[in-house]
Amino acid sequence: MSPQRRNPVLGKSAGPRRQRMTWAGALGRIAAVLLLAWLGGFLWFTLTLPDPAPIAVKTDAVVVLTGGAGRTARGLAVLEAGSAKRMLVSGVDRNTTRKQLAAAADSSKSRFDTTDLGYEAIDTRSNAEETARWVKRHDFSTIRLVTSAGHMRRARLELSRVLPLSVLVVSDAVPVEPTAPSIATEYSKYLLRRVALMLGAL
């Protein structure tokens, strides 16, 4: 009996098909590993969200990053408790006045006598740069950072790029009820920023 002859058409198509299936399988496995890694990191991020700092903890100054309810009021409470000498509110809209900010925080305008408004920052990175300039100008060595729990890690990551190592930063997370989508968004932004910094992209 003569050996079975290979169909040249099938022979030509089988190789590329198997190659495509191999590539698809490899990409699927990579995607699965990345998804599991993201989920594991997200779980860690969620379970270790920072807490508010005790109001009695003293620092030279308090820095409030705008963008969420209760942050400016928290900073004012720190000032009123005598736990900081001065406050920076970073990322204030250019059309917002001191009087309007006082009204929004349900506070008198006089309480803003030791408060500086930062109008230059438009995102977390520029928040950090604005804060670093302010800290250097006043020669502060300790600051209390007020922002949301989900935003805190990314804010501290950006500050670590621009603040001297000698400056101590105390995390003070505003107690708000986070939602799963908001935490997932913050975790993804934090993760992407860490990767960018690791790759040397400022």
Task: Locate predicted features.
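N-terminal Lys/Arg-rich, disordered targeting/topogenic segments
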Residues: 1-24
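Electropositive, gly/pro-rich neighborhoods at or near active sites that engage anionic ligands
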Residues: 3-5, 15-16, 37, 41-42, ...
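Juxtamembrane amphipathic/hinge helix adjacent to a transmembrane helix
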Residues: 8-11, 170, 192-195
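Structural motif marking the loop-to-transmembrane transition
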Residues: 16-28, 177-180, 184
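Hydrophobic membrane-insertion alpha-helices, especially the h-region
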Residues: 25-44
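A structural signal for short, hydrophobic/glycine-enriched beta-strand patches
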Residues: 47-184
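A transmembrane-helix-recognition feature enriched in membrane-embedded lipid enzymes
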Residues: 180-202
